[in-house]
Design a protein with these regions (language model features):
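Short, hydrophobic/aliphatic alpha-helical segments
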Residues: 1-11, 41-44
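A structural-propensity feature for long, helix-poor, extended segments
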Residues: 46-85
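Short, conserved charged micro-motifs
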Residues: 116, 156-161
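Short glycine-/aliphatic-rich beta-strand segments at the starts of folded cytosolic domains
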Residues: 139-152
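Conserved phosphate/anionic-ligand binding catalytic regions in large, soluble enzymes, centered on
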Residues: 9-27
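Conserved small/polar residues in nucleotide/adenosyl-binding loops
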Residues: 163-165
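Non-transmembrane, aqueous-exposed alpha-helical and coiled segments at domain scale
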Residues: 31-42, 70, 76-77, 102
Length: 165
């Protein structure tokens, strides 16, 4: 059974909780996983994100999230201009991603001195999201609770060195 927040949408800049608020959250979680604002981003829109993305502000919301904006940030409609002012280059294209949820975005982020990162996530409605791929590895988390992600080389002592036991 759900709760009242499954019925009421999030406080957000509209028009769509899935295509705008969800997209902003995808961009924001991508930035958080990357650890900083990317200098360059390639954003791919799939399915209904691609079909109605411009009309619902999906493209601007994703860039806003990469800039660190929350879904209720009134600057979302100006995110393209803000990105240019802050020196973040970006490209947004439509892409057919086989087997992906209709509201899927794929983001490749790059910055000097940091390994590139590729994230794939989708908006499930009400401003909620699921991250389904991280650097080509299947994952499943929403960002609604703390999640620890460890990249591990499978060799003796590696995990022990991470957890300091």
């Amino acid at each position: 059974m759900g709760n009242i927040f499954d019925i009421l949408g999030p406080v957000m800049v509209g028009p769509s909780s899935s295509h705008t608020a969800g997209a902003a959250r995808i961009g924001l979680i991508a930035r958080q996983l990357f650890g900083r604002q990317p200098e360059r981003a390639k954003v791919y829109l799939h399915g209904s994100f691609a079909a109605t993305g411009k009309g619902h502000g999906t493209d601007k919301a994703l860039i806003a999230g990469l800039l660190g904006m929350l879904p209720d940030d009134m600057r979302i409609p100006q995110s393209f201009e803000i990105a240019k002012e802050e020196g973040m280059d970006f490209v947004i294209e439509n892409k057919d991603i086989k087997g992906a949820h209709p509201n899927t975005a794929q983001i490749i982020m790059e910055a000097e001195g940091v390994p590139a990162m590729k994230i794939q996530a989708h908006s499930i409605g009400g401003g909620r999201i699921k991250v389904c791929k991280l650097d080509g590895i299947d994952v499943n988390f929403s960002g609604e609770s703390y999640t620890m992600i460890i990249r591990n080389v499978d060799e003796p002592g590696r995990i022990l060195s991470l957890i300091h036991i």
